[in-house]
UniProtKB/Swiss-Prot annotation:
Subcellular location: Cell inner membrane
Composition bias, Low complexity: 200-225, 247-259
Assigned keywords, A-Z: Cell inner membrane, Cell membrane, Cell shape, DNA-binding, Membrane, Signal-anchor, Transmembrane, Transmembrane helix
Family as reported in the entry's similarity comment: Belongs to the RodZ family.
One function term, GO molecular function aspect: DNA binding
Designated name of the protein: Cytoskeleton protein RodZ
Transmembrane regions listed in the UniProt entry: 112-132
Organism expressing this protein natively: Yersinia pseudotuberculosis serotype O:1b (strain IP 31758)
A cellular-component GO term for this protein: plasma membrane
């Protein structure tokens, strides 16, 4: 009997039973208690049935019981000893702190990645610089080769650049021998001499030629008596012959002036100066003004090389041929070009500081 009474007393001494009895004595319902404590009805029911929620921390569970005891006017000192035996305070599980080594590993990996990225950037910059340097060296070597070729041509042509045209090739006629002289007086020109002089005249735009005036003003051997060294020469005939010879030379080429050191009986070869001066008025004319020494090569549409050599600063070169023209310029900044009165843009070649290869006159 004593054992059963002690068991009943133990049952009645649980916190949930004490709280339910106190609530019922005050005439409160579980719903009223839940509203006053701002809790769920299920939470009040679990407290009265001594069911501890698994997902609820013991600290919150003890706090709910204290609030419930205050509401039903039960002293906390009577409930706390029983509550500690029924639901002891569980130690909170503290997660171990992560070591800083993980962050160090991340930083180390990021450092290697940045180093590899910078290495790639440096390699790309190095390759770009090497490529630019190779192109620069190739351009300089090409310019040097052009200058060497031009120097060789100048040395072969007696220090003057000669435009390579068909007219200049025809100008080199077999007239190496000086004009015959009889008793210190010039002999009238023959038909062969007149044709040689006519062919030797340059045919650029700045040098006019009149073959009709030449042939009409020069006497032939059939109308001039032969001069013998033993016979006296008539002064009047000699003067007439000299005047006729002067008229013939004036009709052949008014712009030619005998070069010093050149035989008087041989017509001078056309040089680059034959194409310099004057304004280009013909269709397809190409005008180049040089501000500094520059190597130049001009080829027309037929493949004829109109000019190849070095021009000095201050010179003006006029060329006429069949368009379009293919130009190769060693120093684009040393000249200005106009085609049919319109300037040709060389700015992209000047900025690039390289040999200019362009075609002018393409329709």
């Amino acid at each position: 009997m004593n054992t059963e009474a002690s068991q009943d007393q133990t049952v009645t001494e649980t916190p949930g039973v004490r709280l339910r009895q106190a609530r019922e004595s005050l005439g409160l319902t579980q719903q009223t208690v839940a509203e006053r404590l701002c809790l769920k009805v299920s939470t009040i029911r679990d407290i009265e049935e001594d069911n501890a929620q698994a997902n609820l921390a013991s600290t919150f569970h003890r706090g709910y019981i204290r609030s419930y005891a205050k509401l039903v006017h039960l002293p906390e000192d009577e409930l706390l000893p029983i509550l500690e035996k029924q639901a002891p305070v569980r130690a909170a599980k503290v997660a171990p702190m992560q070591s800083f080594s993980l962050g160090k590993k991340h930083k180390k990996r990021d450092g290697w990645l940045m180093s590899f990225t910078w290495l790639i950037v440096l390699v790309v910059l190095g390759l770009t610089g090497a490529w630019w340097w190779q192109n620069h060296q190739a351009q300089q070597a090409e310019i040097a080769n052009m200058v060497d070729q031009s120097s060789a041509q100048l040395s072969q042509n007696g220090g003057q650049p000669v435009p390579l045209t068909d007219d200049n090739r025809d100008a080199i006629a077999p007239t190496d021998a000086p004009a015959p002289v009889a008793n210190g007086q010039p002999v009238p020109l023959t038909n062969h001499s007149v044709s040689a002089i006519t062919n030797s005249a340059p045919t650029t735009s700045s040098v006019p030629t009149t073959s009709s005036a030449t042939t009409s003003s020069v006497p032939t051997t059939s109308s001039v008596p032969k001069i013998n060294s033993t016979e006296p020469v008539d002064t009047a005939n000699t003067n007439t012959t000299m005047h006729q010879e002067g008229a013939a030379s004036a009709a052949v080429s008014p712009s030619q002036v005998p070069q010093p050191g050149m035989p008087t009986g041989q017509p001078p070869l056309p040089t680059a100066d034959a194409g310099v001066s004057g304004s280009a008025s013909s269709v397809g004319a190409l005008v180049m003004n040089f501000t500094a020494d520059c190597w130049l090569q001009v080829v027309d549409a037929t493949g004829k090389t109109l000019f190849s050599g070095i021009q000095k600063g201050g010179a003006v070169l006029n060329l006429a041929g069949k368009a379009p023209y293919k130009l190769t310029i060693g120093a684009p900044g040393a000249l200005t070009i106009s085609y049919q009165g319109n300037p040709v843009d060389l700015s992209k070649f000047i900025k690039a500081n390289r040999v200019a290869r362009l075609t002018v006159g393409v329709e």
